[in-house]
């Protein structure tokens, strides 16, 4: 089995330098104690070298969907992949009015950072806003508007939000509605919203299947979204938030590494740091986290020979070793950690499936189900596979590429999560 490096994060040191508020605890807060709870989050990545997107004297208006409500909130921005400072002229937050870019004026609030309305985020660092009194409900859409007065490369993004945002000229952060000059296909510089509450958060750590690939745009039908709605329907669990830290193309063991001249050079940077590398940032640092669901491994099997070199080919035992690292790190932080079985992909249009990869998937799934090393198992594979051909997705759950579940498949995955795990 190959050794698995555990790497540090430069952004943590920078966070200490600019920290304006008391940091969130890494372990769950007992129910009944006031705390900050992750209501929405996303994992940032960098962009390909060919992406020349930049903003200057423009407002970015972006929409996020909250999983749990509270009487106040705070917002996290990130300049993790910036090579220079991120200057924010003004930032505001409001509840969305309807399905477009308009906000409810009575809910409009200016964000401050250490009491300042304008702030500079150092290269490589995240930044938390001060708390703002704005009651929000679970399932609400929140609009975050950010004015960037100086030329700013769009270097820190989440590439596949399946949610439109907008860009407009000048500082129109306080406008009820804006006249867009363009549509944003990514989340830029925005990585988290937490609410004040007396509960905790569940982090979904995964790849494109968790990120929501091929689901209906703007409809919030990713399996973590559906799980959050299940929590809200349960009186004992409606205090829990769900934070989606899925990244399309993400792997357990390797960062993006497209072969020279391969088309993947134009998009692979969006796949993000390996789960082993990003675990502290995307799981342990999330506000109020008490539980984590891990669904990873399919890209470790499928990428070598497609968007990654064959030298990065891994075995089932390599994947199991990476899972064990995540389990140990979660337990060391006092978290409950649940393992998801890898879903089927026979006949996929991406070139992932082979007899060898299918055998490795089956071996990993046997270990997840039978080893007892995870605190519990969530059998996503069983939830979406075709009973007549278990190596395939059910046809009514298939988005069309035979790898990613559609909206109905996502709902089936969420229904496969036993709610008793969170009581």
For the regions a protein language model found, what residue spans apply to each?
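N-terminal secretory targeting modules
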Residues: 1-9, 14-205, 210-219, 235-236
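Conserved SGNH/GDSL esterase-like catalytic core that processes O-acyl groups on lipids
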Residues: 40, 56, 61-62, 85, ...
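Solvent-exposed loop/turn segments at secondary-structure junctions
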Residues: 81, 150-151, 208-212, 247-252, ...
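A cross-family glycoside hydrolase active-site/sugar-binding cleft signature
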Residues: 295, 340-341
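Surface-exposed amphipathic alpha-helices with a cationic face
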Residues: 323-331
């Amino acid at each position: 089995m190959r050794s698995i490096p555990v790497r540090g994060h430069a952004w943590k040191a920078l966070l200490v330098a600019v920290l304006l508020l008391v940091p969130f605890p890494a372990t769950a807060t007992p129910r009944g104690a006031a705390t900050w709870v992750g209501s929405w989050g996303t994992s940032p990545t960098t962009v390909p070298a060919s992406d020349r997107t930049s903003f200057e004297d423009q407002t970015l208006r972006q929409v996020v969907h909250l999983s749990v409500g509270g009487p106040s909130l705070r917002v996290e921005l990130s300049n993790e992949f910036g090579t220079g400072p991120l200057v924010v002229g003004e930032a505001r937050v409001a509840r969305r009015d309807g399905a477009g870019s308009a906000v409810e004026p009575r809910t409009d609030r200016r964000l401050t950072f250490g009491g300042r309305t304008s702030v500079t985020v150092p290269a490589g660092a995240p930044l938390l806003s001060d708390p703002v009194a704005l009651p929000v409900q679970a399932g609400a859409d929140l609009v975050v508007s950010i004015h960037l007065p100086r030329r700013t490369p769009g270097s820190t993004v989440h590439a596949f939000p399946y949610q439109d945002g907008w860009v407009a000229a000048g500082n129109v952060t306080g406008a009820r509605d804006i006249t867009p000059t363009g549509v944003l296909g990514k989340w830029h510089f925005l990585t988290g919203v937490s609410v004040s509450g007396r509960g905790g958060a569940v982090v979904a750590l995964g790849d494109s299947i968790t990120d929501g690939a091929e689901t209906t745009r703007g409809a919030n039908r990713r399996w973590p979204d559906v799980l959050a709605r299940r929590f809200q329907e349960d009186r004992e669990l409606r205090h829990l938030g769900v934070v989606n830290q899925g990244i399309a193309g993400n792997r357990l063991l390797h960062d993006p590494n497209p072969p020279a001249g391969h088309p993947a050079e134009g998009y692979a940077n969006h796949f993000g740091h390996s789960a082993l590398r990003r675990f502290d940032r995307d799981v342990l640092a999330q506000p109020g986290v008490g539980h984590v669901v891990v669904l990873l491994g399919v890209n470790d099997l499928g990428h070598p020979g497609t968007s990654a070199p064959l030298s990065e080919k891994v075995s089932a035992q390599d994947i199991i070793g990476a899972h064990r690292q995540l389990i140990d790190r979660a337990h060391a932080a006092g978290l409950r950690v649940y393992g998801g079985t890898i879903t089927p992909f026979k006949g996929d249009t991406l070139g992932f499936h082979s007899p060898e990869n299918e055998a490795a998937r089956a071996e990993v799934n046997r270990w997840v189900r039978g080893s007892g090393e995870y605190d519990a198992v969530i059998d996503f594979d069983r939830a979406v596979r075709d009973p007549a051909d278990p190596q395939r997705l059910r046809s009514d759950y298939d988005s069309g590429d035979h790898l990613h579940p559609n909206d109905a498949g996502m709902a089936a995955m969420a229904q496969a999560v036993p709610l008793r795990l969170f009581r």
